[in-house]
């Protein structure tokens, strides 16, 4: 009986080994595929963050010329101008790069600084309605067109960033992505707060035609 059982035992052992090898191959393929998907979405978040920062910088670059143009009108409210300059300086004090959004404290500070800047610009534009001569200024009108474009691009870029982060953060909480994220050190990304998400749904209106 021993001589007959040996071939049968060897057959099942070979089957077991083949099955284990196939299982390991499948697990390996799944893990590699999961890693590639996480890496892809991580890069999408980085790209979205980079685009958002670029659009914020474009708006920031418009402010000095806007302030200098408005300063030419002596009766213009100086406090409003000071608020804009101060808000711009607050943004400039933060070390900005795409890794910024991986630090919740820095991201919150940067988000608040940008929100404050947007609000101060809105007040500046609202008060400008009182000054027909300022609104008729060609340079001012050109700056308004550029600012309107900047605000629209910021709104789009922020929306894309929020969606990219949502997708990434959801993915790394799901199996088997969560295992890969832990092993490879992929952490949760910082997203905008609910308050800011509501704010971006309404693009600031820049209108000098009235």
Question: Language-model features: where?
Answer:
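Extreme N-terminal basic, low-complexity initiation segments
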Residues: 2-8
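A helix-centric hydrophobic-segment signal that preferentially recognizes long
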Residues: 9-210
């Amino acid at each position: 009986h021993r001589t007959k059982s040996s071939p049968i035992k060897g057959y099942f052992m070979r089957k077991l080994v083949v099955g284990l090898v196939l299982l390991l191959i499948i697990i390996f393929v799944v893990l590699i595929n999961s890693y590639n998907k996480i890496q892809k979405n991580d890069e999408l978040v980085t790209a979205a963050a980079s685009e958002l920062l670029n659009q914020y910088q474009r708006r920031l670059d418009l402010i000095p010329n806007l302030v200098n143009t408005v300063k030419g009108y002596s009766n213009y409210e100086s406090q409003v101008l000071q608020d804009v300059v101060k808000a711009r300086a607050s943004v400039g004090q933060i070390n900005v790069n795409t890794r910024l959004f991986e630090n919740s404290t820095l991201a919150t500070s940067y988000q608040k600084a940008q929100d404050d800047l947007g609000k101060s610009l809105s007040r500046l534009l609202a008060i400008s309605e009182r000054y027909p001569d300022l609104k008729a200024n060609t340079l001012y009108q050109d700056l308004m067109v550029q600012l309107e474009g900047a605000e629209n691009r910021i709104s789009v870029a922020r929306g894309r960033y929020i969606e990219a982060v949502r997708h990434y953060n959801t993915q790394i909480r799901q199996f088997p992505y969560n295992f890969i994220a832990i092993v490879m050190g992929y952490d949760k990304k910082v997203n905008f707060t609910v308050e800011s998400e509501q704010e971006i749904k309404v693009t600031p209106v820049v209108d000098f035609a009235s």
